[in-house]
């Protein structure tokens, strides 16, 4: 069993039950899924960049991403409906905990001038979104093989009803929020 999953069952669940006075342990919020999305705008002119982005996401997450396509045509961006413009991965279960553990303990501390993640990035329904400016913070990415620095959005979806519950859950998991 994963280190974080074990910690959730043994330490975090009792702590949240006592803090929020839940009647049942089933009311305790948990991380449902993590969605990693990267937009590749250059894919319109050069399809090889999309292949590189897909390969990097596969290395980071250990799961093959889905190629996302344009919903509408936009003449200003020379974009046609249905053109591939990005990639996304949805992680659940064991892989989700592995990725979250790696994100919190290895990748985020590698960010330059890192002072913690923003507390304001909750959406009002207990989900947390975080933007990463470069994929180089992940240990799986080889610096010499990177053709272009790309960012990505990481959405952590929880079953929490409020932002306060979600913030407490992520703090217990070791998410480094700003002071």
Swiss-Prot record:
GO terms for cellular component: ribonucleoprotein complex; ribosome. GO terms for molecular function: rRNA binding; structural constituent of ribosome; tRNA binding. Pfam families: Ribosomal_L5, Ribosomal_L5_C. PROSITE patterns: RIBOSOMAL_L5. One of its GO terms (biological process) is translation. Gene3D superfamilies: 3.30.1440.10. It comes from the Bacteria. InterPro entries: Ribosomal_uL5, Ribosomal_uL5_bac-type, Ribosomal_uL5_C, Ribosomal_uL5_CS, Ribosomal_uL5_dom_sf, Ribosomal_uL5_N. Keywords: Ribonucleoprotein, Ribosomal protein, RNA-binding, rRNA-binding, tRNA-binding. Part of the 50S ribosomal subunit; part of the 5S rRNA/L5/L18/L25 subcomplex. Contacts the 5S rRNA and the P site tRNA. Forms a bridge to the 30S subunit in the 70S ribosome. PANTHER family: 60S RIBOSOMAL PROTEIN L11-RELATED. HAMAP family: Ribosomal_uL5_B (MF_01333_B). This is one of the proteins that bind and probably mediate the attachment of the 5S RNA into the large ribosomal subunit, where it forms part of the central protuberance. In the 70S ribosome it contacts protein S13 of the 30S subunit (bridge B1b), connecting the 2 subunits; this bridge is implicated in subunit movement. Contacts the P site tRNA; the 5S rRNA and some of its associated proteins might help stabilize positioning of ribosome-bound tRNAs. Belongs to the universal ribosomal protein uL5 family. This is Large ribosomal subunit protein uL5. It comes from Bacillus anthracis. The gene is rplE.
């Amino acid at each position: 069993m994963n280190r974080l999953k074990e910690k959730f069952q043994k330490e975090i669940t009792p702590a949240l039950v006592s803090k929020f006075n839940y009647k049942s342990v089933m009311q305790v919020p948990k991380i449902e899924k993590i969605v990693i999305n990267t937009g590749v705008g250059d894919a319109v002119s050069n399809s090889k960049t999309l292949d590189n982005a897909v390969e990097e996401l596969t290395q980071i997450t250990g799961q093959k991403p889905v190629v996302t396509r344009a919903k509408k045509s936009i003449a200003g961006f020379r974009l046609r409906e249905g053109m591939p413009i990005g990639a996304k991965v949805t992680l659940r279960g064991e892989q989700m905990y592995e990725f979250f553990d790696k994100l919190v303990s290895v990748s985020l501390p590698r960010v330059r001038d890192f002072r913690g993640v923003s507390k304001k990035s909750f959406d009002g329904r207990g989900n947390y979104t975080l933007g990463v400016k470069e994929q180089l913070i992940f240990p799986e990415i080889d610096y010499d093989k990177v053709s272009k620095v790309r960012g990505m959005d990481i959405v952590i979806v929880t079953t929490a009803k409020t932002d306060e519950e979600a913030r407490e859950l992520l703090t217990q998991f070791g998410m480094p929020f700003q002071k």
